[in-house]
Amino acid sequence: ARFAKAFVRGKFRIKHWGRRRLTLELKRKDISKLVINQALAEIDDEEYMQLFSDLTEKRANIIKESNVFKKRKKFIDYFLYRGWESHLVYEKAYELIK
């Protein structure tokens, strides 16, 4: 349990992984669902959403693509790969990239 909590804190704060990626990586290491849920509870919802908002705004400005659809796809792929929830990613993509 201690490993899972430290893993979640580190990967969330340093690598900026979302909950889906954290869950998958812990499952890959044969950690039980109960321990995974306890570890994910360490992440404050407000902090989670604030980090997501900051990262998305920064990323939207970094992507240099003139075609809106390609830019949106790159944006979406970037965050889905890092395990952020798809409904959050799509909502933010259509909000920031027009």
Predicted feature locations:
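An alpha-helical, amphipathic repeat domain used for nucleic-acid recognition
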Residues: 1-98
